[in-house]
């Protein structure tokens, strides 16, 4: 009997006790992503036996990220030293139209590798076993197969599996589960130009290049990253180089990769051949498709599955599903926008709507969109124009 669910199951896997006794109780997490390590930490801290398999001992390379302070709601003790820089507002540009968006609470600029390293320490300290250098290569009956670079293989049996191995998840492929759609992401480290405010990020809407946007995120008073996200098949390096040249900026280094996107029919829980698989983070498409941000929502997804496995219900997962669904609907509208649509939108934003946008964290859009429409009901016409096009 196969089961795969996009909607949340009302019958999560019940915990079989909170002690570490019994091999049948252990939880296998495949992938040392931020979402995977966060889930490992929370589950191990609650007394569950957790083993994390990660093929890359270095836990992947650096990437500068921007997150909202909503992260503190999920991780109250997030270390202050992990915040490299604070962003107090955004400059939004479309053509020649500019809108300054002050934030009530500053966003944080963080470094992915540093956050992973810290979570690795927390997970190990809580009792999770971290096995690096092992790649998941498939399954044989009820056994999971892992291989080292030297060709050594081991086979493990685990009833509960958290797939935390990214947008191109091998786990989901091995179990015949759908993987999320992906976007390309590329950004260049640059010296901040004289016209840039170190306290404000800049967003340019250029739909003829990408249905998403370009960004400049300062990570210090002197430097930042300029990048874009776009769909596979578009010449992302050419687009970035051209935009850098247009702004008169020289790339110092590049950071790139793929990022998952959310789709409502992606499974949150699936049963296959005696296993129960929970995709989290990018593997689960737990990414805000409006902004292509997945750090906070990935952590949210890891915590939601931990709550379910510990018998605390699916409430947190349902809230995340509603949040990602709201971003999905807004993205469907924005992907139809032309440059003229963005110009009209920025030009037409009133003071109340601008203030509301700055007060609502991007990780609370599901509730905030109603506040925004209440502040400026006329925005509905922009949404309808995008939907009907």
Task: Please state what every model-predicted region is.
Residues 19-35:
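Beta1/beta-strand and adjacent pyrophosphate-binding region of the FAD-binding site
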Residues 232-309, 314-316:
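FAD/FMN-dependent oxidoreductases across multiple families
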Residues 35, 58, 168:
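Conserved Rossmann-like nucleotide-cofactor binding loop
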Residues 28, 32, 41-63:
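Glycine-rich FAD pyrophosphate-binding loop
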Residues 22, 74-77, 81, 85-174, ...:
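Conserved N-terminal helical subregion
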Residues 56-78:
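Conserved N-terminal glycine-rich FAD pyrophosphate-binding loop of Rossmann-like flavoproteins
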Residues 307-389:
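C-terminal helical "tail/cap" subdomain of flavin- and related membrane-associated enzymes
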Residues 168-241:
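Conserved FAD-binding catalytic core of PHBH/FMO-like flavoproteins
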């Amino acid at each position: 009997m196969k089961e795969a669910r996009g909607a949340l199951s009302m019958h999560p896997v019940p915990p079989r006790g909170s002690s570490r006794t019994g091999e049948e109780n252990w939880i296998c997490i495949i992938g040392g992503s931020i979402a995977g390590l966060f889930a490992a930490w929370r589950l191990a801290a609650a007394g569950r036996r957790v083993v994390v398999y990660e093929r890359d001992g270095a836990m992947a390379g650096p990437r500068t990220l921007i997150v909202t302070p909503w992260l503190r709601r999920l991780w109250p003790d997030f270390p202050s030293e992990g915040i490299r820089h604070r962003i107090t507002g955004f400059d939004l540009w479309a053509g020649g139209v500019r809108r300054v968006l002050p934030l009530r609470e500053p966003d944080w600029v963080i470094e992915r590798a540093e956050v992973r390293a810290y979570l690795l320490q927390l997970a190990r300290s809580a009792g999770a076993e971290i096995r690096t250098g092992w790649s998941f290569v498939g399954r044989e009956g009820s056994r999971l197969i892992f291989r080292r670079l030297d060709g050594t293989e081991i086979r493990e049996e685990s009833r509960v599996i958290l797939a935390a191995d990214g947008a191109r998840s091998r786990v989901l492929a091995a179990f015949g589960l759908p993987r999320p759609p992906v976007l390309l992401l590329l950004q260049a480290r640059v010296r901040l130009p004289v016209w840039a405010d170190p306290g404000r990020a800049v967003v340019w809407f250029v739909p003829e290049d990408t249905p998403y946007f370009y960004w400049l995120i300062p990570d210090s008073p002197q430097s930042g990253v300029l990048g874009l996200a776009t769909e596979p098949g578009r010449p992302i390096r050419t687009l970035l180089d051209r935009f850098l040249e247009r702004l008169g900026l020289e790339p110092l280094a590049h950071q790139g990769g793929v990022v998952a996107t959310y789709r409502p029919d992606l499974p949150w829980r699936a049963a296959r051949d005696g296993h129960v698989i929970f995709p989290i983070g990018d593997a689960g498409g737990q990414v805000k498709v409006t902004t292509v941000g997945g750090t906070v929502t990935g952590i949210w997804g890891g915590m939601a599955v931990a709550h379910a496995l510990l018998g605390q219900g699916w409430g947190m997962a349902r809230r995340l599903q509603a949040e990602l669904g709201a971003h999905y609907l807004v993205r469907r509208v924005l992907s139809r926008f032309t440059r003229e649509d963005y110009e009209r939108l920025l030009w037409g934003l009133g003071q109340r709507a601008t203030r509301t946008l700055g007060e609502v964290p991007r990780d609370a859009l599901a509730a905030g969109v109603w506040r925004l429409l209440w502040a400026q009901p006329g925005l509905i016409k922009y949404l309808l124009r995008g939907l009907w096009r």
